[in-house]
Amino acid sequence: MTTQVPPSALLPLNPEQLARLQAATTDLTPTQLAWVSGYFWGVLNQQPAALAATPAPAAEMPGITIISASQTGNARRVAEALRDDLLAAKLNVKLVNAGDYKFKQIASEKLLIVVTSTQGEGEPPEEAVALHKFLFSKKAPKLENTAFAVFSLGDSSYEFFCQSGKDFDSKLAELGGERLLDRVDADVEYQAAASEWRARVVDALKSRAPVAAPSQSVATGAVNEIHTSPYSKDAPLVASLSVNQKITGRNSEKDVRHIEIDLGDSGMRYQPGDALGVWYQNDPALVKELVELLWLKGDEPVTVEGKTLPLNEALQWHFELTVNTANIVENYATLTRSETLLPLVGDKAKLQHYAATTPIVDMVRFSPAQLDAEALINLLRPLTPRLYSIASSQAEVENEVHVTVGVVRYDVEGRARAGGASSFLADRVEEEGEVRVFIEHNDNFRLPANPETPVIMIGPGTGIAPFRAFMQQRAADEAPGKNWLFFGNPHFTEDFLYQVEWQRYVKDGVLTRIDLAWSRDQKEKVYVQDKLREQGAELWRWINDGAHIYVCGDANRMAKDVEQALLEVIAEFGGMDTEAADEFLSELRVERRYQRDVY
């Protein structure tokens, strides 16, 4: 694989400093490197003694608090950019993760900014669930002295677009808060809206918040920035796909791939619990089909981010073709005056259903029209990377990263269709072929700091991925804590992902217990939540012993069913009523003993 040299313009070190750093760390293990990273982070964030000794009186410096509630990293990036803007304006600002925010202090906030995404069916990001629940409970305080603003990120292809932001905005107002600005709901292409909103927030706050003296400017609460790398979503690493192995059986209804990617000597680091971002290319055959349906040639010039490209290239590399949205359907109907689609306009439910069941290319096939190239480009959304839970630990695989990919395949009236990123990895990248990747760090899905702490892992289907990483790490660390896995899929013989590895972990004593749910191997369907109830007494003993609970997989059904089963176990074996059980689980979440990576 070609050596990846980090772009020098992106590095804060000069070549001599970089060489000294590499020489000093060349013989460190991954665990030692992680410790060093944390050590320097701590050094960086220790306030100078002189500042600590002479803090400004609180009355003179009503600070601004930014709460970042992020699921995939976009909300965090917006919050960090706003923090930097406010510091540049010499305003006193604190940035915190929603999961780290002591929400009972919200009554004392004078200036509060919330940047949030939405997941599942309108739920807040995992790290903001406890805060959201608190604000909507009877315990929520009045906020008459709080001025606030909310920036909400979402995806208009989903029914509950930006619902989390709408919730926070309406509840903060209901509790007596004063809106600094109207809420902004941003779609997938959020950057321009975020930039404009940040400028408006700075202007609004400059007129209300006292300017901090240079010696008092506080850059506290930098969110998830202990991870420094020249590679990012906007500057991905060009890595190499080394393994593409189908790990479901020949007769399985699912096509699940184990993908290994060689990071070479890039120095890219990750931890168990992180996600891998993958930039993909659309299938050239799909591009050709769409272009021909619109009576275009593919060589028409179009403008993409200020650059002129041939239409075929723009569609393959820059635009989303495999996910339709209600907005696209509505705009296409209006643009083409389609007799089939125009009756849907104005009916949100029908538009959502049509978009969910009809890919863009089939919408054009069923309602043909002739568009010019620029009109087509303006209709589509920008291509965005897909995130996959990482299925490996660098303590074992070193300069590789593994992911578990469920390939999306389906038919539309006899025509085969596939997911953009999953089919790219499974079908279109040759071994040793290039893949553009980056790490999306997730500090809200981490193994316990204490290696003696028991771990309960619940991950049906491809939700098993991060727990493979967890076990590799626990084995490498020789962690004495007990480990319990709940896994489920349709059939034992066809769908037992990584079966040999789990059996080895059981044999070696690394995996203390494993409970399996095969939903189609018997007349009565059995799911992981049924296994949780079945093992309720033992599960409660583990929880009482301080176990951390992890859930990974489908957010819309599985995660809710699993949470309901956990609540029932806590109520029954903990001797609690429903309300007390809910409060108990919320406390586990606040203590980082109940963590979820759901999508």
From Swiss-Prot:
This enzyme's EC code(s): 1.8.1.2
Residues the entry annotates as binding FAD: 322, 356, 386-389, 404-406, 410, 419-422, 599
Key words, A-Z: Amino-acid biosynthesis, Cysteine biosynthesis, Electron transport, FAD, Flavoprotein, FMN, NADP, Oxidoreductase, Transport
Reactions it catalyzes: hydrogen sulfide + 3 NADP(+) + 3 H2O = sulfite + 3 NADPH + 4 H(+)
Domain spans labelled Flavodoxin-like: 64-202
GO biological process: cysteine biosynthetic process; hydrogen sulfide biosynthetic process; sulfate assimilation
GO molecular function: flavin adenine dinucleotide binding; FMN binding; NADP+ binding; oxidoreductase activity; riboflavin reductase (NADPH) activity; sulfite reductase (NADPH) activity
One Pfam family per UniProt: FAD_binding_1
InterPro entries per record: CysJ (IPR010199), CysJ-like_FAD-binding (IPR003097), CysJ_Proteobact (IPR029758), FAD-bd_FR_type (IPR017927), Flavdoxin-like (IPR001094), Flavodoxin/NO_synth (IPR008254), Flavoprot_Pyr_Nucl_cyt_Rdtase (IPR001709), Flavoprotein-like_sf (IPR029039)
Major enzyme class: oxidoreductase
Residues that hold FMN according to the record: 70-75, 117-120, 153-162
Cofactor binding note: Binds 1 FAD per subunit.
Pathway, per record: Sulfur metabolism; hydrogen sulfide biosynthesis; hydrogen sulfide from sulfite (NADPH route): step 1/1
Cofactor: FAD; FMN
Residues involved in NADP(+) binding: 519-520, 525-529, 561
GO CC list: cytosol; sulfite reductase complex (NADPH)
Domain FAD-binding FR-type: 234-448
Family: Belongs to the NADPH-dependent sulphite reductase flavoprotein subunit CysJ family. In the N-terminal section; belongs to the flavodoxin family.
Function according to Swiss-Prot or TrEMBL: Component of the sulfite reductase complex that catalyzes the 6-electron reduction of sulfite to sulfide. This is one of several activities required for the biosynthesis of L-cysteine from sulfate. The flavoprotein component catalyzes the electron flow from NADPH -> FAD -> FMN to the hemoprotein component.
Listed HAMAP family: CysJ
Quaternary state and interactors: Alpha(8)-beta(8). The alpha component is a flavoprotein, the beta component is a hemoprotein.
NCBIfam families from the UniProt entry: cysJ, PRK06214.1, PRK10953.1
Protein name: Sulfite reductase [NADPH] flavoprotein alpha-component
Organism annotation: Escherichia coli (strain K12)
